[in-house]
């Protein structure tokens, strides 16, 4: 069998012809099953452009080992092994021949007869391990006569027992012979047939194996409890905030009681310095400048005493209108009283922040979990990933938009039913998921066509898939999002803000200041 043919059979049937490299008497051999060849044996594959040079068996074995790598890596490995590398031109032809796709290579080399691997390994054993079965070693003369049955004479000569001599009185020749026969019978009964290809198969598959359990991951649990640390951190932050509020409330209560006691007794005792009660002494630093007052009709003493000793201005002459009454500057104490009175009257501050509505479902590409990553950080993060990292779903979210070095807040909600009629005037964008029930309870009777006429709408979809069929019928901006190319997110999401800003300039100019336009 030609070495190239043996290598081809190994590629096609590796279990029947396993590859094995052995060294016998300092000579390296490549064995395919029981067929062994020297490593430097030349094959019938001719090198391209050189009619008198052929690839050696070792070169093809190295090529077969690194055939899955690119050509540059293979050339480095071949140079490290000290063999000739298969050229890039011959690479495809050699691969097709080894896989059996081509058989048209000319047989230019003489066929090399293989050696038996078992005989090579047997010949390499030391003399002490070889069984002495020949008659000459046993001291018996060899029969040199010719016979018609040489096979029977060889078998009979192999079956002759080795000369046995007694060692002592207890271990006689008969005793030693009996022990040898008993040992031989035990060996024959205990023989287990072992496939010689198992060792080669194990060595070939060892680089591809992966350790499933190690001493570290075997102690890991099946549940992911990493979010427990986030829960503890948020709870600790809330505890610190509550403790700080309690301290501030205690200081204010102490100062208030001291002020009341001082006013009742005609004396006011000033409390010690506290960093939590800075507002209690703010009225001492406030300058009561009466910008709309007048000094006409006042004397120097009244001016020096301030508004506590303001005297009644003299009556104006009949031909002159009365002077305007000086207005006191609003101090911290008056501001506090006015704020408390406003709170008692039930007045509520009206929000002026723009509003963006996102879907509330979990099977969408955008909702309250990842809207900050998309519209503020310009990076797409899947909803499931952000959901695992977040303790609970945010109810009302505020994202920040940087414009000309100024930060603007935009409110994001997923429940449009709680919006009043005035709030709908501040809605600047809607993100749709492709179903009509999303707009149930919305303004304009929940009609998607009317909603998209008054508010710009956007729909995110994977760039490899088409948008939902229902979305294709709506006036919606389709934004494709790549599943792997995160560097394209900023350009895609910037288009969303550009569309929103153009809409606000044209249709809602009262919100331009809220977006820095």
Swiss-Prot record:
Alphabetical UniProt keywords: Activator, Nucleus, Transcription, Transcription regulation
InterPro entries for this protein: Cdc73/Parafibromin (IPR007852), CDC73_C (IPR031336), CDC73_C_sf (IPR038103), Cdc73_N (IPR032041)
Main location: nucleus
Gene Ontology MF: a single term: RNA polymerase II complex binding
GO annotation, cellular component aspect: Cdc73/Paf1 complex; nucleus
GO BP annotations, alphabetical order: positive regulation of transcription elongation by RNA polymerase II; transcription elongation by RNA polymerase II
Ranges annotated as biased composition (Basic and acidic residues): 124-135
Transcription regulation among keywords: yes
Subcellular location: Nucleus
Consequence of gene disruption: RNAi mediated knock-down is embryonic lethal. Embryogenesis proceeds more slowly, with embryos displaying defects in the positioning and shape of epidermal cells. 60% of embryos arrest at the bean stage of embryogenesis without any significant change in body shape. Nuclear localization of rtf-1 is unaffected.
UniProt similarity note: Belongs to the CDC73 family.
Subunit structure: Component of the PAF1 complex which consists of at least cdc-73, ctr-9, leo-1, pafo-1 and rtfo-1.
Function: Component of the PAF1 complex which is a multifunctional complex involved in transcription initiation via genetic interactions with TATA-binding proteins, elongation and transcription-coupled histone modification.
Protein name: Cell division cycle protein 73
